[in-house]
């Protein structure tokens, strides 16, 4: 199973390493990241524990997390497949980018590459992801990465006492590769 791959020219996915703790801490200092984090990352120890957990899950085969880096190995973001169900060959995709990397196609390129890796290397068939409906940028990432809209989960998430609806997307191993960045994928005809 590959742990380092080219996502697109100048963009790479590689396993997280302990040396990335500072980059993780810096990324989570962004208010947008803090707002959506399941667990706070406010100290070097928090960042180190987060990375150690990713390594444990990789070894166990329950989740595979990659740092998204440029040619100089600068961390631009994160992409992962988790909640892996081997019986049904499914997984859940998550991603984030640093403030400086947003809006440049980093997340969609990383998600496209992760999906192909999950199908080819991890043997999964179906990948799912979701985003709050008030996050149109994440919806564009999903579409550009070939994830078709499937539906709405009402009031699924709660942040600071406020419930949020989540739009769900999925991509199958049999779906065509996304034809063009920025264009939503269409589900195959049934």
Q: Where are the language model's segments positioned?
A:
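Acyl-donor (CoA/ACP) binding surface of acyl/acetyltransferases
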Residues: 1-32, 65, 69-190
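Hydrophobic residues in alpha-helical segments
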Residues: 28, 37, 58-59
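Short, P/G- and charge-enriched loop/turn segments at secondary-structure junctions
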Residues: 1, 53-55
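Juxtamembrane/interface motifs at transmembrane-helix termini
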Residues: 42-46, 55-57, 97-98, 186
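Short loop/turn motifs at secondary-structure junctions and domain boundaries
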Residues: 56-61, 147
């Amino acid at each position: 199973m590959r742990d380092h791959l080219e996502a697109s020219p100048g963009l790479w996915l590689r396993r997280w390493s302990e040396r990335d703790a500072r980059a993780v801490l810096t990324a989570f200092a962004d208010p947008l990241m803090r707002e959506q984090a399941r667990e706070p990352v406010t100290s070097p120890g928090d960042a180190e524990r987060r990375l150690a957990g990713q390594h444990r899950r990789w070894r166990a085969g329950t989740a595979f997390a990659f740092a998204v880096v440029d040619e100089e190995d600068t961390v631009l973001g994160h992409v992962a497949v988790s909640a892996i169900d081997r019986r049904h060959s499914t997984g859940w995709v998550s991603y984030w980018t640093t403030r400086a990397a947003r809006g440049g196609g980093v997340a969609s390129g990383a998600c496209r590459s992760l999906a192909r890796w999950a199908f080819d290397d991890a043997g999964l068939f179906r990948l799912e992801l979701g985003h709050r409906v008030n996050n149109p940028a994440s919806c564009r990432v999903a579409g550009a990465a070939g994830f078709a809209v499937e539906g709405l989960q009402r009031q699924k998430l709660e942040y600071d006492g406020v419930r949020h609806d989540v739009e769900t997307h999925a991509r199958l191993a049999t779906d065509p590769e996304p034809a063009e960045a920025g264009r939503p994928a269409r589900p195959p005809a049934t």
